Design a protein with these regions (language model features):
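Beta-rich, aromatic/charged-enriched effector core domains that present basic-aromatic interfaces
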Residues: 81-227
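Glycine/tryptophan-enriched, flexible segments
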Residues: 161-305
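An acidic- and aromatic-residue-enriched active-site/binding cleft used to recognize and process polar
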Residues: 10, 33, 73-76, 103-105, ...
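Glycine-rich phosphate-binding "P-loop"
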Residues: 65-80, 341-343
Length: 349
């Protein structure tokens, strides 16, 4: 059955089970579209990073033996919007089945559901195989509760995956949370470790974004783009973090400095949010370092990091899906004024 399989820009999972089974009848589709890139003003570094990572993922799939269509933002065959591109390709290629991966955004989830309902061909939806708590698990945890306690969710995840547990159902060290030990102020005299930065010349991508008239915020040195845009680079950044930065991450995870922009943070958010690396492999790498160097990495350090990955990250996703679409319009403090211009352009002088 001739199949079109859509991969969104934040679904670049190099270890997904479907990656290992090339099918001559299935074409993977990677799209750069104006509607999905410009529905809000994204940071220019984010847009460049996504486009570069999507390009690398397309090449990866091709090397694995998959058929891939990668339509760039200014390509002549680009029909402008996600839906227009899908409809055109389904008709042009005489597609008999449409597949896509579960989106992580309510707006896009609804959009693809509605579009699928208009098709006269079968539709299959795949899990992204990324998050530790599937949507069904999230629904069971949050259903019918008046309060969504992160600590309860975090403990459930620790137990479920046996992370920092003593083997008897108890937390390692006797405590679940060492947050009280991870709130030190930054000492300006303390020596820091420089972040691992990559160097990519993406001036061509920046020019394409400008040509497409996509409105963005922020600034970028496109000739020296320093974020990871492949799984290989993401793993390099992970290993750098656990080897050099993790020993002091927890202690200063809430600290800020006007002289140091990254301190001991992993800077893995982009790699995780594009799914180039899996949260469990991130946690396992950190745990391996903790077990290897117990004299360097204290329990409070590793617990502080684990809490961010399997606690806050997974928990906030759960709250999002439990409350959407109402969640998007909540205004607890009843703020009415618009954000000032300097919030977007950083010009405070």
């Amino acid at each position: 059955m001739k199949t079109l399989r859509l991969v969104l820009g934040d679904q670049l999972n190099y270890t997904h089970s479907l990656v290992y089974t090339p099918d001559a009848d299935t074409t993977w589709l990677i799209l750069e579209t104006k509607d999905e890139t410009g529905y809000v003003d994204h940071h220019i570094q984010k847009v460049i990073g996504f486009f570069a990572a999507m390009y690398n993922y397309a090449r990866f799939l091709e090397k694995k033996g998959h058929q891939v269509i990668h339509i760039k933002i200014n390509d002549s065959q680009n029909k402008g919007s996600l839906i227009n591109n899908l409809s055109n390709l389904i008709q042009e290629l005489k597609i008999e089945k449409f597949e896509y991966f579960l989106p992580d955004e309510f707006r896009l989830d609804e959009r693809l559901k509605q579009y699928s309902n208009t098709l006269s061909i079968p539709v299959q939806v795949w899990d992204t195989e990324h998050f530790l708590a599937e949507r069904a698990t999230l629904g069971q945890f949050f259903e019918g509760k008046k309060e969504y306690l992160m600590e309860s969710f975090y403990r459930m995840m620790r137990k479920r995956y046996g992370i920092l547990m003593d083997g008897n159902g108890k937390p390692l060290g006797g405590k679940w949370n060492y947050d009280a030990e991870n709130r030190k102020k930054w000492d300006a005299k303390k020596k820091t470790i420089p972040p691992l930065l990559f160097t990519h010349n993406f001036t061509d991508i920046a020019l394409e974004i400008e040509k497409a008239q996509i409105k963005t915020i922020g600034s970028v040195n496109a000739a020296a783009f320093n974020w990871p845009v492949s799984r290989k680079e993401s793993l390099e950044l992970l290993h750098y973090f656990v080897n050099y930065l993790l020993p002091q991450f927890g202690t200063y995870q809430d600290a800020m400095s006007i002289n140091e922009w990254s301190l001991f943070h992993s800077r893995l958010s982009f790699s995780l949010n594009t799914k180039m690396i899996h949260p469990l492999e991130v946690v396992r790498a950190a745990l391996a370092a903790f077990e290897k160097w117990p004299e360097k990495i204290s329990l409070s350090q590793i617990e502080g990091f684990v809490r961010q990955i399997i606690g806050w990250r997974e928990y906030m996703r759960g709250v999002y899906w439990a409350w959407m679409p109402e969640f998007a319009g909540l205004n607890y403090f009843n703020h009415q004024r618009k954000l000032p211009v300097w919030f977007w352009n950083a010009d405070t002088q």
